UniProtKB/Swiss-Prot annotation:
Hybrid [4Fe-2O-2S] cluster binds at H242, E266, C310, C401, C429, C454, E489, K491. The modification Cysteine persulfide is found at C401. Belongs to the HCP family. It is found in: Cytoplasm. It is an enzyme of class 1 (oxidoreductase). GO terms for biological process: response to hydrogen peroxide. It comes from Thermoanaerobacter sp. (strain X514). Gene3D superfamilies: 1.20.1270.20, 3.40.50.2030. This is Hydroxylamine reductase. GO terms for molecular function: 4 iron, 4 sulfur cluster binding; hydroxylamine reductase activity; metal ion binding; peroxidase activity. Keywords: 4Fe-4S, Cytoplasm, Iron, Iron-sulfur, Metal-binding, Oxidoreductase. [4Fe-4S] cluster binds at C5, C8, C17, C23. It comes from the Bacteria. It catalyses: A + NH4(+) + H2O = hydroxylamine + AH2 + H(+).
Length: 547
């Protein structure tokens, strides 16, 4: 069997993974993910009609965003999960067809995504090998379809987190279905798909705004916070991923047990929320970005809870300490399900922690963050004054993702080389390349302002729009803000599309441009939006500073 996947920044040789994913997923899992996406496109096609007829069901929305989320890079590697999810998808698809039939709605059965069938698991795997990315022959149409699909995957992840906290928007679900249905439509042109990609950007903004509302309404607005990066002498649980509801339940259930809780990776920003500060056993952040987990999980000694991406295939030395939940999966790793009441029982992982040694200290000190839009706007007068007096000459948005590539040391060197009158605005795990450098401050304003998780790139957009208003500008691109963004997976794609929708131009992406962008599509993005790559720190610095 073979595969073809180029959805992440680490696509093999900058082209695509064909034997095994650089991420670690096997060819059969990659193909099954393709078939799940194909079937979700069919469900989307049908559910649009169900919405029009008023016979759509909320469970379809949830199935859609959970299914999409499970195919994001470093979320789920479990073959059996995808076999079962595909079977559920086919059953749901047939249920929607039946509902449409009862409502007197005719369905065009010529679309393969809504009519393929199977008898055995072998049938599923055979079909999976036929419906992947390369089944679209035209390179440019394929490129645009994948750009949209990956953007919708990112949107689905953010919609999932908002939904976990009780927030949803049917307009977002409707767009996701519309976009997935349209990538099946062979009558659409490249121009149609460019327009659809920008529309995805609009709904990306809406989804990030919804998640921001969900998080801040539930846990309060992030505030300036110093986070401990050392350890205590108690056993601990390390929680990674992005799911704040999982963290809340874990903190509640570990209270008074003698077990400490540490964040890892993208969970770091949880410390910025007021609601989590009441837990004395919520100790700090352990380690760095996701790709270093193979060493850090080993040293942590206690169990690790993966709530979302990024999971790296675990080494045998700590595999028995890894627990997954939500849509995360890996064969042979313990899974903690959600109960019928929406709650999770973390007693097993807590008891496991009690049997473990305390974490090995790998660093000590503090890092500062919590500069989401509400906090930054409280500092607006100070920031505006610093800009007007020339104390701050330029802001650099360096949000995004971190990754394994050695060339990503560029971002550390770039941050070090920035003039002392510049400020970095960041969100996502890209921050780990420079958030421990001690770059100082400008009139009390730290030179690295961390807004939070990757979805908190929304905060950076809100800050930019507010600065545009304060300075009386009619174009966001006239602000002294440059965009030097590191990307890795599909959530970064929806953030990019959101920025393009908001009119931001001259965004530089690295360490490489996406493999899924064909030369012609890349040219459109360069010509229309000024998208660029990166070269080296010295030349890029001159370019950004207008020298």
């Amino acid at each position: 069997m073979s595969m073809f996947c180029y959805q992440c920044q680490e696509a093999s040789q900058g082209i695509g993974c064909t034997v095994r994913g650089v991420c670690g997923k096997t060819d059969d899992v990659a193909n099954l993910q393709d078939l799940l996406i194909f079937t979700l496109k069919g469900i989307s096609f049908l559910n649009l009609k169900a919405r029009e007829a008023g016979v759509n069901k909320e469970k379809t929305d949830r199935f859609l965003f959970e299914g999409l989320f499970s195919t994001i890079t470093n979320v789920n590697f479990d073959r059996n999960f995808f076999i079962n999810k595909i079977k559920e998808a086919v059953a749901l698809r047939e249920e929607i067809k039946e509902d449409l039939k009862k409502a007197g709605i005719e369905v065009d059965e010529s679309c393969e995504a809504i009519n393929w069938v199977y008898d055995t698991d072998e049938d599923i795997e055979a079909i999976a090998a036929e419906v992947g990315v390369l089944s679209t022959k035209d390179e440019d149409i394929r490129s645009l379809r994948e750009l949209i699909t990956y953007g919708v995957k990112g949107m689905a992840a953010y919609a999932y987190h908002a939904y976990q906290l009780g927030y949803k928007d049917d307009n977002i679900f409707r767009f996701m279905e519309k976009a997935l249905a349209k990538v099946l439509d062979d009558s659409l042109t490249a121009d149609d798909y460019v327009a659809l990609a920008l529309e995805a950007g609009k709904y990306g903004v809406d989804t990030m705004a919804l998640l921001d509302k969900a998080n801040t309404s539930t846990y309060g607005h992030p505030e300036i916070t110093k986070v401990n990066i050392g350890v205590r002498n108690n056993p601990g649980i390390l929680i990674s991923g992005h799911d704040l509801k999982d963290l809340e339940q874990l903190l509640e259930q570990t209270a008074g047990t003698g077990v400490d809780v540490y964040t890892h990776g993208e969970m770091l920003p949880a410390h910025y929320y007021p609601a989590f500060k009441k837990y004395p056993h919520f100790v700090g952040n352990y380690g760095n970005a996701w790709w270093q987990q193979d060493k850090e999980f080993e040293l942590f000694n206690g169990p690790i809870l993966m709530t979302t991406n990024c999971l790296v295939p675990p080494k045998d030395s700590y595999k028995d300490r890894v627990y997954t939940t939500g849509v995360v999966g890996f064969e042979g790793v313990k899974y903690i399900p959600e109960g019928p009441d929406g709650k999770k029982d973390f007693s097993e992982i807590i008891e496991h922690a009690k049997r473990c040694k305390p974490p090995v200290e790998i660093e000590r000190g503090e890092i500062i963050g919590g500069f989401a839009h509400n906090q930054v706007l409280e500092l607006a007068d100070k920031i505006v004054e610093a800009v007007k007096t020339g104390a701050i000459k330029r802001f650099f948005v360096m949000a995004g993702c971190d990754g394994r590539m050695k060339s990503r040391t560029y971002y550390t060197e770039f941050a070090k080389a920035l003039p002392k009158d510049t400020v970095i605005l960041t969100a996502g795990c890209a921050k780990y390349r420079y958030n421990k450098l001690n770059l100082g401050d400008i009139n009390g304003i730290p030179r690295v302002l961390d807004a939070g998780q990757c979805n908190d790139s929304y905060s950076l957009a809100v800050i930019a729009m507010k600065l545009k208003e304060v300075f009386g500008l009619n174009d966001i691109n006239k602000l002294p803000i440059s965009y030097n963004i590191a990307w890795y997976e599909q959530k970064a794609v929806i953030v990019l599309l959101a920025l393009l929708y908001l009119g931001v131009k001259n965004i530089h992406l690295g360490p490489t441009l996406p493999a899924f962008l064909s030369p012609n599509v890349t040219k459109v993005l360069v010509d229309k939006f000024g998208i660029g790559g990166i070269t080296n720190v010295e030349d890029d610095m001159k370019m950004f500073m207008g020298e």
